[in-house]
Structures are given as structure tokens and as C-alpha cells.
A protein has these predicted regions:
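A conserved acidic beta->alpha catalytic loop
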Residues: 27-37, 52, 82-83
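Conserved donor NDP-sugar-binding/catalytic core segment of glycosyltransferases
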Residues: 87-123
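Short beta-strand-to-loop acidic/aromatic patch adjacent to the donor-nucleotide binding site
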Residues: 72-83
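Non-catalytic, C-terminal membrane-associated alpha-helical segments of glycosyltransferases
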Residues: 235-286
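Short, flexible, basic/aromatic active-site loop/helix in glycosyltransferases
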Residues: 125-146
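Short, well-formed alpha-helical segments that are part of the catalytic scaffolds
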Residues: 1-20
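A short, conserved alpha-helix in the catalytic core of glycosyltransferases
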Residues: 153, 159-164, 169-196
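Glycine-rich, basic loop-to-helix element that forms the pyrophosphate-binding segment
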Residues: 50-67
Length: 286
């Protein structure tokens, strides 16, 4: 399935390509409703137009439930800007099938993602106190990780009811991390597949600070990032290791967004508002 938000022609082309490989659902969070024919989508695609931005979590839940009702056993999840290769489309569900035989508690698997703007292939991640542990994507065997980004991941639908849906109160940021953390807290497994790659752009245009490139976002996205980080820090099932790392990173992020991203005041204001709303329990759309 793919989540649309104000898609361009390339997004439609990517969706049509996916539909040639697997049953495909497109959930569109664009404010203006269009038909699948107007967009140029393949007739085989199930198209759900929300007519409003209901958030990534709601859109994912809609698409995943649609695939489950259609009798699918797994769900490949993509952002509209992701470029999955034919190899990934064929092999990721096959890897999940093999891993399910070995362990029926495998909930999610995913490739290493590659963003050339941020320096190439990103490592997989395990939580550590004060600092994330980075696992380089090498070798052929899947490796256990603490979370995966949504795009490019393949979800075992047999685990969906037990783990539960994506948390719609988060709206957008940390939705993937929260679901993985919840799955692992219930004894399920998340696996990275180092042999597979996904071309994916994380965030907007990066900003370079002291030689390191950070993904750029709008001030509103930074609101959600800080609000949801605080919200997750307050939840008991979220590991202390992740909380400690996030508390270290939060002031650094705040400084980067407030000093190096324009308009500086808007980024700083929305980030601080997010922190405040996280403390008072504000959830959902801004």
C-alpha cells in the first residue's frame, strides 16, 4: 500500500508499477478529492480518498485493514516518494514467508534505506543508553532491530490484531517507532534485511551543520516530532534506553532547528509548542 499526499505524476507512476507486482491500495490524504481515473491510477488499484489530511497513522490503518480484508497475508508499506526495486518487491515478502516459518512472532521486516542526500545507506538501529547502537547492513541474514521506518517495510498481517493498529493520536512522526516498540513489548520480533535496499528520501532538503547533514522538515513537522517524542517518553512500555537517547538528542535538535533552519523563529516556536503540547497530553492533528 502507498500513502499519497498531494502526489505528482511520478507518485502515480510508482503506484501503478507496484500494482503490476501485488494487489495495491492507495490511501490519499490530499485535501482536494480526485478520482483514481483523474489521477491516472491503474484500474486494479483500490483507491481511498480521504479528502483531508488525516495523518499517516490513519492512512496506514485504512490501507492495512483493506489488504487484510482482501485476504492478504502481508502488507508492503510505502511512502509516495519511495523507489522500490523489482528485487525488493519480489524478495521482501519471500523473506518474511521464510522467517514466519522459523518464528511466527516476526511482526515486521524491512530493508536498509538509502538516501544519497544524507550520505548513502543508513544503518539499522538498536536502542542504547544515551546513544543509539548502529548496526551496519552487511551480510545475508536478517538481523533483529528495535525499529524500522515505515516505508519499504513488510508487515506480517497475522500479528496485526494482537499488536494493534498504528497510533492515530501521533498523527505523523514516530508512528513507525511506536508500533515497533509496542510490538516488541508484546514479545514480537522486528527484523532488518541487510541484503535488500530501498531508495528513500528522509524528510525535506537536508541542512549541513558542522560537517554533518540533517534531514530538513517544515516547522509544523518539527512540532509533531517534539510533541510525539515527549508523549512517548511519558509512556511506560517505551524502553528507558530510547528515552535516555531522546533526552540527549532533544536539545541538540532544538538548537539545530532554531539556529540553522529558516525561518528560524518559526522552527523554534513550533518546536517549543510541540514540547509543551507533549507535556500536557495534546494529541492528534495540530
Amino acid at each position: 500500500m502507498i500513502v499519497f499526499y498531494r502526489p505528482d505524476r511520478d507518485c502515480v507512476i510508482r503506484a501503478n508499477r507496484l500494482a503490476r507486482a501485488w494487489p495495491c491500495v492507495v490511501v490519499d490524504n490530499t485535501e482536494c478529492v480526485a478520482t483514481s481515473e483523474q489521477l491516472g491510477l491503474d484500474p486494479q488499484i483500490t483507491y481511498l480518498a480521504n479528502g483531508a489530511n488525516l495523518g499517516i497513522a490513519t492512512a496506514l490503518n485504512q490501507g492495512i485493514n483493506c489488504l487484510k480484508e482482501a485476504g492478504c497475508t502481508c502488507a508492503l508499506l510505502f511512502d509516495q516518494d519511495s523507489e522500490p526495486s523489482s528485487q525488493l518487491l519480489a524478495e521482501l515478502p519471500a523473506v518474511l514467508s521464510v522467517e514466519r516459518v522459523r518464528n511466527d512472532r516476526v511482526a515486521l521486516i524491512g530493508p536498509a534505506y538509502e538516501d544519497l542526500r544524507l550520505g548513502g545507506v543508513a544503518p539499522f538501529v538498536r536502542f542504547g543508553y544515551l546513544k543509539l547502537k548502529r548496526v551496519q547492513p552487511t551480510g545475508q541474514q536478517p538481523v533483529e532491530v528495535d525499529f524500522l521506518i515505515t516505508s519499504g517495510s513488510c508487515l506480517n498481517l497475522a500479528t496485526w490484531a494482537a499488536i494493534g493498529p498504528m497510533d492515530e493520536s501521533l498523527f505523523i512522526d514516530f508512528v513507525d517507532l511506536e508500533w515497533c516498540v509496542r510490538a516488541r513489548s508484546k514479545g514480537y520480533v522486528v527484523l532488518g534485511v541487510p541484503a535488500l535496499r530501498l531508495s528513500h528520501e528522509l524528510g525535506g532538503e537536508p541542512v549541513q551543520v558542522f560537517g554533518r547533514r540533517y534531514p530538513g522538515h517544515s516547522p509544523v513537522r518539527h512540532y509533531y516530532l517534539f510533541r510525539n517524542a515527549v508523549a512517548l517518553i511519558r509512556r511506560g512500555y517505551v524502553p528507558l534506553s530510547w528515552k535516555s537517547t531522546e533526552l540527549v538528542k532533544m536539545p541538540i535538535r532544538l538548537a539545530i532547528y532554531g539556529l540553522f533552519m529558516r525561518p528560524r523563529l518559526a522552527h523554534l516556536r513550533m518546536s517549543l509548542l510541540g514540547i509543551w503540547h507533549g507535556f500536557i497530553g495534546r494529541a492528534g492533528a495540530l
